[in-house]
């Protein structure tokens, strides 16, 4: 079930290079906000980029930042410092709202 309101379907889809996750993108010259939803269990491989802040809306997120793993549940927030290597595991049905420092982190489909 999608936790976001139906009007969010009008927000552009984000082009994500990972199978099993979809998202909606709101972008500005100063950063991006992406509303992610894991359709199935998803493993995000290690990577790095500009700063990121997020909140778990539904489900569970296991986030590993600089080798330290932490599990987040609905209502909990997380922050990834700029340049920090990180990876993630999202359970099926997990929804996140992520704010990215980089204004060009993702592109719309």
Regions found by a protein language model. Give the residues of each.
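Short acidic-glycine-tyrosine-enriched beta hairpin
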Residues: 67-82
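Conserved short histidine dyad/triad with adjacent acidic residue
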Residues: 29-48
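A short, N-terminal "cap"/entry segment at the start of jelly-roll beta-barrel domains
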Residues: 1-30, 34-35, 109
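Short beta-strand His + acidic residue motifs that chelate non-heme Fe in jelly-roll/DSBH
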Residues: 44-46, 63-64, 80, 85-91
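Glycine- and acidic-residue-biased ligand/ion/polar-headgroup-sensing regions
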Residues: 49-62, 66
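Ligand-binding loop in jelly-roll beta-barrel domains
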Residues: 82-107
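A cytosolic small-molecule/anion-sensing beta-strand core signal
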Residues: 57-58, 73-74, 92
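Structural motif
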Residues: 32, 60-62, 69, 85, ...
